[in-house]
Curated annotation (Swiss-Prot):
GO cellular component annotations of the record: alpha DNA polymerase:primase complex
Function: DNA primase is the polymerase that synthesizes small RNA primers for the Okazaki fragments made during discontinuous DNA replication.
Organism: Dictyostelium discoideum
Gene3D superfamilies given in the database record: 1.20.930.80
The organism's place on the tree of life at top rank: Eukaryota
Residues annotated to bind [4Fe-4S] cluster: 279, 358, 376, 414
Full protein name: DNA primase large subunit
Alphabetic keyword roster: 4Fe-4S, DNA replication, DNA-binding, Iron, Iron-sulfur, Metal-binding, Primosome
Obligatory cofactor(s): [4Fe-4S] cluster
GO molecular function: 4 iron, 4 sulfur cluster binding; DNA binding; metal ion binding
Region annotation Disordered: where it falls in the sequence: 449-470
Lineage: Eukaryota, Amoebozoa, Evosea, Eumycetozoa, Dictyostelia
Length: 470
């Protein structure tokens, strides 16, 4: 279990609301890697969709109540309804974890901008009076009647900027705050400075909140970046997971690693011998031998196959044949069809499940002694791992190297296995996702084919040249 952080107590419920809105106080609750992975990916997808929707609306110069509804529907789709009991936990956990992922990423500015768009939309859906009351603890003061009368002529400029009549407003429509808090509003002439303090019209209050949020996010990400080495040592599996996140704008709903080519059910067997990581090879071989794979194994192996390009129709046929030694077609439809459809997002909440990452597979590994075959083989019985290496024909030297590497980390051992399967490869970092293993293998064999074709082409040119010389 991971603890997300320590709770900071606020002085008032209103400031709590503001801190929650701006994600200022780190929440305090227990969570596991499965929650972190799913919540982070859902928020990442939400931000991607928010960014695309914002671009569309900007191009259309649109900003209507329907647009606000579109944003609200996006949030509900990925984070759930704000009325749900788990919404606050999912919202805060996913935000803070993505901060850690983005603090030193090239997508950092995208993250800040898109989170700001999300906040702006939430503000648009909130009552302005409620928002203002939430920020009383920030030192943003309403203008007193005395100040209003004293500076009425100056404040009249802001009223004209808002296309209103001075007779329609009073002191409650204005706020003052330190001028350094809102340089953008000053630059755009939406604020005036009187005796070192900035005065704004109430309609610009939301802009002030957004600007404050952006400044705070830059500060917070810098602080996290400075502390990331310690966090990496304390939660290495978390940092490993972040490396599998797609780039902003990829449009993928889960960490995907480059494979877009479809495969057929007939391809699974030969690919298992050349390009499957050990965890998937163990499950596949067991499935072939026993015509059985427990629920967790079916999830891990099934989503892996989907990730390497096995379409839904092919997956149905693959699993039907795999279980045919012990179940009829009718029993297969009753026992397994729904779960396969569910994995492909065709049942339930239409969630298109992603391949499991290494941290998640490790967290799901059965205890030593269990006869279950799912999970990470590098953290389970060394005797069983050694026997599997022998079965695969891995020589003594390579076998010892892999077994020794398990003492360092399962990722190091998995990378050793990859290197032995793919001599003279160009892999430059540790394997941290089964689908990364597969995709790197595909790249390896693609490169070999290209070199082979280039060599054949070169030989043919030499032959033709030799004939011409004769």
């Amino acid at each position: 279990m991971l603890r997300a952080g320590k709770k900071t107590n606020s002085q008032t419920s209103t400031s709590n609301d503001a801190c929650s809105l701006l994600y200022i106080n780190v929440p305090d609750f227990n969570c596991n890697m499965s929650q972190i992975e799913n919540y982070c990916i859902d928020r990442f997808n939400l931000l991607n969709e928010v960014s695309k929707l914002k671009d569309t609306l900007s191009a259309q110069k649109s900003n209507t109540s329907k647009d606000n509804e579109d944003f609200r529907n996006l949030s509900s789709r990925f984070l759930g309804s704000t009325k749900d009991e788990q919404f606050k936990i999912k919202d805060e956990l996913s935000h803070y974890c993505l901060r850690l992922a983005m603090c030193d990423s090239t997508d950092r500015n995208w993250f800040i901008t898109t989170e700001s768009i999300l906040l702006a939309n939430r503000l648009n859906q909130s009552d302005l009076t409620t928002i203002i009351s939430s920020f009383k603890g920030f030192g943003w003061s309403p203008v007193s009647q005395e100040e209003y009368e004293q500076y009425q002529d100056d404040l009249g400029y802001l009223v004209k900027k808002a296309n209103l009549n001075l007779n329609e407003v009073n002191n409650t429509h204005f706020y003052k705050l330190p001028f350094q808090d809102i340089p953008k509003l000053i630059d755009t002439k939406k604020a005036i400075i009187i005796k070192g303090e900035a005065y704004i019209y109430i309609s610009n209050f939301k802009d002030m909140v957004i600007h404050t949020f952006k400044n705070y996010m830059n500060f917070a990400l810098d602080r996290i970046k400075a502390d990331k080495t310690r966090i990496k040592e304390e939660f290495p599996e978390l940092i490993q997971f972040f490396t599998t996140l797609p780039k902003a704008g990829d449009g993928t709903n889960k960490p995907q690693l480059g494979n877009t080519k479809h495969i057929r059910k007939e391809d699974v067997s030969p690919l298992s011998k050349t390009s499957f990581p050990m965890c998937m090879r163990v499950m596949y071989d067991s499935l072939v031998e026993t015509s059985s794979l427990k629920y967790e194994g079916r999830l891990q192996f099934g989503t892996f196959l989907k990730g390497i390009g096995l379409p839904y129709d092919e997956a149905i046929n693959f699993w039907r044949i795999a279980f045919s030694k012990r179940v009829s077609n009718t029993d297969f439809d009753k026992e397994y069809l729904y779960n396969i459809r569910h994995n492909y997002g065709l049942e339930g909440k239409s969630t298109n499940y992603s391949p499991y990452s290494c941290p998640r597979i490790i967290s799901k590994s059965p205890h030593n002694g269990d006869k279950l075959v799912h999970g990470c083989p590098y953290i389970q019985s060394l005797e069983r791992l050694e026997q599997k290496l022998l079965d695969l024909g891995i020589d003594d030297f390579q076998r010892i190297q892999i077994l020794e590497a398990t003492k360092t980390s399962p990722n190091v051992a998995c990378t050793k296995h990859f290197n032995f399967l793919h001599p003279n490869n160009t892999l430059t970092k540790l394997i941290n996702h089964p689908n990364q293993f597969y995709d790197q293998s595909m790249e390896y064999y693609k490169t070999l084919e290209e070199k082979k074709s280039a060599k054949q082409s070169n030989n043919k040119e030499n032959e033709n040249q030799s004939i011409d010389e004769k």
